[in-house]
Amino acid sequence: MTTFSPYAARRARLAAQLGSNAIAVIPTAPERPRNRDSDFLYRHDSYFYYLTGFSEPNAWLVLSGSGRATLFCAPKDLEREIWDGHRLGPAAAPEVLGVDEAFSVSELDAKLPRLLENSAAVWYPFATHKGLETRVDGWLSAVRSRVRFGALCPSRA
């Protein structure tokens, strides 16, 4: 891994453009299966890598307008690492990548509605990742279900 200062500066520039009460959800590219037991050589998403310097598959960056960066990545799994290669894991990600916090990607659907609460807008790459719009709609529905408890749902997506 390289030093994270240029990536942190890029995240700060994007956060400033988002506005103080907005949030961006940026996924990396998925792995592409070649056949039943192997995948094509992985190529990360350029936007994601530009902001994080992180080139593992199945990861998400959530960036708030205040500059808070949350990474969701694959957990450490020594058995899978034999076949897939080294994984950084959520415990090491904040120190290595300079993000504020990191969680396992398995927690994404549970944590993202809370991160989206009380935001005016949510930004994400439209029509670039299969199924992303559906997931964002699901997260926004979860926020809408909490409106009677005082949560505000983003009005722009």
For each feature predicted by the language model, list its residue ranges.
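A composition/biophysics-driven feature that prefers long, compositionally simple stretches
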Residues: 1-157
